[in-house]
Structure formats: structure tokens, C-alpha cells
From Swiss-Prot:
InterPro entries: Alpha/beta_knot_MTases, tRNA_m1G_MeTrfase_C_sf, tRNA_m1G_MeTrfase_TrmD, tRNA_m1G_MTases_N, tRNA_MeTrfase_TRMD/TRM10
Localization annotation: Cytoplasm
Alphabetized Gene3D superfamilies for the sequence: 3.40.1280.10, tRNA(m1g37)methyltransferase, domain 2
Family indicated by similarity: Belongs to the RNA methyltransferase TrmD family.
Tagged with keyword S-adenosyl-L-methionine: yes
Name recorded for this polypeptide: tRNA (guanine-N(1)-)-methyltransferase
Positions bound to S-adenosyl-L-methionine: G113, I133, G134, D135, Y136, V137, L138
Gene: trmD
Length: 248
């Protein structure tokens, strides 16, 4: 998968290209990340990349010409196959369904805003989609872009050692993940659930599924609005609720 990033701070993306799962994906040729800095497309000796907004008000906007030229350079490198995404608080909120959609793309160009944002006409003429990672304000689009890259890269075949790792992640099936345990068997008086030590794979599967459903019910009940539970899941949820009520 190829990703182009328009950013005033390309050095930040070493966190993606040099470390962890995404770093290994880059090293193994499964993921390619290229950056374009609008400062490299300026024509003044100060490398100016911000400009005053029409109508006044606080803050500055990213200057149109360097930003637009950087986007055009990324498009030229990617070809017609690239989808241009602007990371914006006004965009569609990123969730696992959205990540799955984006992971089907061969090429993505991510535009990272700074200051008060970008000229609306850039969005109208150069951007295909706007995406947001949440209802809060950040200093720029770099962290959202890295979040998107990391989440999408996990779904690229071969990036994770086992595809089951992605399939069992929180939200992969619309549910939160179940609890996980490793050694030692007892920690500060708390034991690993006996079922996980039983060796009975079917019982372990059912326990994990029930815990996943129950955790979603307790912590993120709104997620059930978009889920159609199977008969098995409905039964496990009813059992979980009954056991929770008894222990309350």
C-alpha cells in the first residue's frame, strides 16, 4: 500500500516509518510512505507557508500555492489511483468500518492541515474525502494522519504476523476486545480465569466472545445500535447480564 503525506513536519512520520508494526511493514515492502513539505514549494526566501484569512479573525491559514503544489506533486507520483484525504474535525469520524473501507485503496494521499486550516477551495477542488479521528482539537493533522496510517496498515495482508491478530482486535466485528492475560498465573491476589488454563478451545472461544459482548454492553452500549447479534451472541449476552446482576 502506498501513502503520500502532505505535511509541514515530515520528520514526525518517522514514528510510522521507523518503528513498530508499520516500521516493519515499510522495511518489508508492504507499506510505502512518502512525504511532501509545502515549504519545498515556496518561492520566497522565508519559505512562507501561512497567510491571513479574508474577513479577519485570529490565526492564519495555510497558504494556497505551496499547499496546492505539494498536493499536485503527490498526485503526480501516485497517478490517478490515489484518493486525497484531508484530516479535519469536520470530516467523517474514523471507526473500524471506515478503516476497512480505506484499507481497500491502493493509494492514499493524506493532507495535514496546520494553523486554522486550509482554504475551502482547496478542499473543494483537490480533496476527495474528509476524515476526523474525534471531536476534539489538535495542533495539526499529523497525529490523525499517523493514526489513520497505523490502523489501515494493520489490515494490509502480511503486515501482522497473524491475520487473526487483526480479526480479534477491538471493533473488528463491531465489539470491544475481550480481556487478555499472560504470566504469572497470579498477580497481587488476582488469578487468570480458570477457563483460559483449561485447554478447552471451545470453552475459551465462548468465554472470550462473552467477555467481548459483555464489555461492549457495559462500556459502549451505543455500539449495539449498529450490530445484529447472532443467536449465540444474544444467549451469551443474556448470561453475562444475569451473572452481572447477581454479583452486583
Amino acid at each position: 500500500m502506498w501513502l503520500g503525506v502532505i505535511t509541514l513536519f515530515p520528520e514526525m512520520f518517522r514514528a510510522v516509518t521507523d518503528f513498530g508494526v508499520t516500521g516493519r511493514a515499510v522495511k518489508n515492502g508492504l507499506l510505502e510512505v512518502q512525504t511532501w513539505n509545502p515549504r519545498d514549494f515556496t518561492h520566497d526566501r522565508h519559505n512562507t507557508v501561512d497567510d491571513r484569512p479574508y474577513g479577519g479573525g485570529p490565526g492564519m491559514l495555510m497558504m494556497v500555492q505551496p499547499l496546492r503544489d505539494a498536493i499536485h506533486a503527490a498526485k503526480a507520483a501516485a497517478g490517478d489511483r490515489a484518493k486525497v484525504i484531508y484530516l479535519s474535525p469536520q470530516g467523517r469520524k474514523l471507526d473500524q468500518h471506515g478503516v476497512t473501507e480505506l484499507a481497500k485503496s491502493e493509494c492514499l494521499i493524506l493532507v495535514c492541515g496546520r494553523y486554522e486550516g486550509v482554504d475551502e477551495r482547496i478542499i473543494q477542488t483537490e480533496v476527495d474525502e474528509e476524515w476526523s479521528i474525534g471531536d476534539y482539537v489538535l495542533s495539526g493533522g499529523e497525529l490523525p494522519a499517523m493514526t489513520l496510517i497505523d490502523s489501515v496498515a494493520r489490515l494490509v495482508p502480511g503486515v501482522l504476523g497473524k491475520q487473526a491478530s487483526a480479526e480479534q482486535d477491538s471493533f473488528s466485528d463491531g465489539l470491544l476486545d475481550c480481556p487478555h492475560y499472560t504470566r504469572p498465573e497470579q498477580l497481587d491476589g488476582l488469578d487468570v480465569p480458570a477457563v483460559l488454563l483449561s485447554g478447552d478451545h471451545e470453552k475459551i472461544r465462548l468465554w472470550r466472545l462473552q467477555q467481548s459482548i459483555g464489555r461492549t454492553f457495559l462500556r459502549r452500549p451505543e455500539l449495539f445500535e449498529n450490530l445484529a447479534l447472532t443467536d449465540e451472541q444474544t444467549t451469551l449476552l443474556a448470561q453475562f447480564v444475569n451473572e452481572t446482576d447477581k454479583s452486583a
